[in-house]
Swiss-Prot record:
Lineage: Bacteria, Bacillati, Bacillota, Bacilli, Lactobacillales
Biased composition (Gly residues): 23-35, 42-51
Assembly with partners or alone: Part of the 50S ribosomal subunit.
Protein name as catalogued: Large ribosomal subunit protein uL15
Gene3D superfamilies in UniProt: 3.100.10.10
């Protein structure tokens, strides 16, 4: 085998389709755009959601709800995730981010009661569910709303 004899693997390199190069090429004359009309012209085409003048779907459907600009979205942490910390540790939002349990604090961190807590911890967060608060205090830990 010589350097000039090297060939790419079969089917690994697709040949570019050259349009408008004669009718016998299969893509001549209209270049795969069909006959005349808006879509055959250069820069032609209809805008997104246009249905030929018929009332588009997004206008036929009723409006629903609104977006509250003052909404608060909390980063959620479950009790079983808190078992990653050592017994007697203080768990704060900064510690949770450093440990990789939470990506971003958002409007604060909310602790939920899914799973089982096996360690005594001091947990500081923006919100707690009742079950989470009870589980933390039952293990001898403490809860602090910040």
């Amino acid at each position: 085998m010589k350097l000039h004899e090297l060939q790419p693997a079969a089917g690994s390199r697709k040949v570019r389709n050259r349009v408008g190069r004669g009718t016998s090429s299969g893509n001549g004359k209209t270049s795969g755009r069909g006959q005349k009309g808006q879509k055959a012209r250069s820069g032609g085409g209809v805008r997104l959601g246009f249905e030929g003048g018929q009332t588009p779907l997004f206008r036929r459907l009723p409006k629903r709800g609104f977006l509250n600009i003052n909404r608060k979205e909390y980063a959620i942490v479950n009790l079983d995730q808190l078992n990653a910390f050592e017994d007697g540790a203080e768990v704060t939002p900064v510690v949770l981010i450093e440990a990789g349990i939470v990506k971003a604090e958002k409007s604060g961190i909310k602790i939920l009661g899914n799973g089982e807590l096996t360690k005594k911890l001091t947990v500081k967060a923006a919100k707690f569910s009742k079950s989470a608060e009870e589980a933390i205090t039952a293990k001898g830990g403490s809860v602090e709303v910040i």
